[in-house]
């Protein structure tokens, strides 16, 4: 972890990065699941559900990016592998 002077101890920053990586992992896996449903939706409500799921995964993408960037700003490293996502995820 690189040194960052933002008024938090290294322990506090490490704890925050750990939590952010958990959020990042859950968000990424949720995005994958949402895209899968988006691709597979059928039926009379196809258009509205398809659009809703697209909006959701686009919002998740923004959240994922912000979470990863915040982790870096705290001096940590955002998880970025399938193995890492599965390690930290709770969904």
What is the meaning of each model-derived region?
Residues 18-21, 25, 51, 58:
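A generic "alpha-helical surface" signal
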Residues 23-39, 67-70:
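Long, well-ordered alpha-helical segments
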Residues 2-4, 37, 42, 81, ...:
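Glycine-rich, flexible loop/turn motifs
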């Amino acid at each position: 972890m690189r040194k960052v002077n933002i008024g938090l101890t290294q322990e506090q920053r490490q704890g925050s990065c750990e939590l952010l990586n958990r959020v990042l992992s859950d968000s990424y896996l949720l995005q994958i699941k949402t895209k899968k449903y988006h691709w597979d939706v059928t039926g009379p409500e196809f258009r509205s559900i398809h659009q809703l799921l697209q909006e959701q995964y686009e919002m998740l993408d923004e959240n994922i990016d912000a979470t990863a960037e915040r982790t870096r700003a705290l001096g940590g490293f955002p998880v970025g592998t399938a193995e890492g996502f599965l390690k930290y995820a709770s969904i």
